[in-house]
UniProtKB/Swiss-Prot annotation:
Classification via Pfam families: M20_dimer (PF07687), Peptidase_M20 (PF01546)
List of residues binding Zn(2+) 1: 81, 142, 199
Annotated localization: Cytoplasm
Cofactor binding, per record: Binds 2 Zn(2+) ions per subunit.
Family listed: Belongs to the peptidase M20B family.
Binding site for Zn(2+) 2: 142, 177, 381
Enzyme kind, highest EC tier: hydrolase
The name this protein goes by in its record: Peptidase T
Length: 407
């Protein structure tokens, strides 16, 4: 095996519970991420050859592999996140399936199976080594596969000084899954020409377009009276919430959109006759379409208040991140390099928009163009998550190829 420590490194990482917590007020949101960075990652960063390794109060573990050839003038960064998504991450027991036969994979004793009839992506991996869950937790390949791949690439470069490269900066950060990990990222400290998040899915993914994103919070104020005498007096806040939602386009929902189509997504609805609350996320790719979606919500709220004769609908909109294409398309160098490297490795680049966001969405707007590379995970964020060891190895190949690339 070209990278003999990759599998064991990955298994070590995923067994540590680093689930983030969106209700927390601390950074990182969970102490487990701090402990993972300080007790697991930082010692290993030093072991694999990174220098000037340190932990920042923003939750990022940072390190540098110095250039070994002055003709490589670009400084390149690689970033992955430590936290895992909002699914059980306690006592993760990964299964290693060698030489996958293409059939059904029982997930431990859970009664759940990875079945190609349900997950057609499995057909691509016959004969490969797969790492799965035992059916009771997620796996955490999102994004501990990325961390393991970056760490392994650095280890390989340190052991092979004949591979010439420029300065490499590495950052492992918190809370990507709850959308705040990059909020406090120190771009000035990281100091690279461009970077890559290693946080994508299947082999070949290369992404530089994300949604632009906003959150919408609505409060509906009702008036509760006895239902027996409610005529022309009661205002049902729950009905107001329903009325608001019904005025959004029925086709513009996550379950009915794909590709470059945006949406409104009702995330939470709660309340009583007296008061109700609704939370939405708003997503689109183009700036004009994104702004139009937010404006449409304002128009609906204003119209309802006008019809009701009082301010019973309150809307608060907050932008979360923007499509990093706006930054990256100004200089496509990181895309051209990654694409050329993949093609040299006989990897077919898959350049498609991310129907979501990455840490790179925010970091790009901090002045460091940061597209996203594949890390290998499939079915992420749940019990059916799995990753191919061979795809992880190819990700390591790609990282090494990028840093050693000369125009």
């Amino acid at each position: 095996m070209k990278y003999p420590n990759l599998l064991e490194r990955f298994l070590t990482y995923v067994k540590v519970n680093t689930r983030s917590d969106e209700t927390s007020t601390t950074t990182p949101s969970t102490q487990s991420q701090v402990d993972f960075a300080k007790n697991v990652l930082i010692p290993e960063m030093k072991r694999v050859g990174l220098e000037n390794v340190y932990y920042l109060p923003n939750g990022f573990a940072i390190g540098t592999l110095p250039a070994n050839d002055p003709s490589f003038t670009r400084k390149i960064g690689f970033i992955s996140h430590m936290d895992t998504a909002d699914f059980n991450a306690e006592n993760i027991q990964p299964q290693v399936i060698e030489n996958y036969d293409g059939g059904v994979i029982p997930l431990g004793q859970s009664g759940f199976n990875l079945d190609p009839a349900d997950f057609a992506s499995l057909h691509k991996y016959k004969g490969q080594t797969l790492i799965t869950t035992d059916g009771t937790t997620l796996l955490g390949a999102d994004d501990k596969s990325g961390i393991a791949e970056i760490m392994t690439a650095i280890e390989y470069l340190s052991a092979h000084p004949e591979i010439k490269h420029g300065e490499i900066r590495v950052g492992f950060g918190p809370d990507e899954e709850i959308g705040i990990g990059a909020d406090k990222f120190d771009a000035e400290d990281f100091d690279v020409d461009f970077a890559y998040t290693v946080d994508g899915g299947p082999l070949g993914e290369l992404q530089y377009e994300t949604f632009s994103a906003a959150g919408a919070e609505l409060t509906f104020q009702g008036r509760n009276v006895h239902p027996g005498t409610a005529k022309d007096q009661m205002v049902n806040a729950l009905q107001l919430a329903i009325d608001f939602h019904s005025q959004l386009p029925e086709t513009d929902r996550p379950e009915k959109t794909e590709g470059y189509q945006g949406f409104y997504h009702l995330m939470n609805l709660s309340g009583t006759v007296e008061e109700a609350h609704a939370s939405y996320i708003v997503r689109d790719f183009e700036t004009e379409a994104f702004e139009n979606r937010k404006a449409a919500m304002k128009v609906i709220a204003e119209k309802m208040n006008q019809e009701l004769g009082s301010e019973r609908v309150s809307l608060t909109l907050k932008d979360q991140y923007y499509n990093m294409k706006q930054v990256i398309e100004k200089d496509m160098t990181p895309i051209h390099i990654a694409k050329a490297v993949m093609e040299n490795l006989d990897i077919q680049p898959i350049i498609e928009p991310i129907r979501g966001g990455t840490d790179g969405s925010k970091i790009s707007f901090m002045g460091i163009p940061t597209p996203n590379l594949f890390a290998g995970g499939e079915n992420m964020h749940g019990r059916f998550e799995y990753v191919s060891l061979e795809t992880m190895e190819r990700a390591v190949d790609t990282i090494i190829g990028i840093v050693s690339y000369q125009d």
